């Protein structure tokens, strides 16, 4: 539950910071 959902936003935030 929320596996993806949690990984999707996490990866998006890191891509914007990097």
Curated annotation (Swiss-Prot):
One of its GO terms (cellular component) is extracellular region. GO terms for biological process: proteolysis. One of its GO terms (molecular function) is aspartic-type endopeptidase activity. The keyword Aminoacyl-tRNA synthetase does not apply. It comes from Ovis aries. It comes from the Eukaryota. This is Pregnancy-associated glycoprotein 55. Keywords: Aspartyl protease, Glycoprotein, Hydrolase, Protease, Secreted. Its EC number is 3.4.23.-. Its main location: secreted. Glycosylated. Belongs to the peptidase A1 family. Transmembrane segments: none annotated. It is an enzyme of class 3 (hydrolase). It is found in: Secreted.
């Amino acid at each position: 539950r929320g596996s993806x959902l949690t990984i999707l936003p996490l990866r998006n935030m890191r891509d914007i910071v990097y």
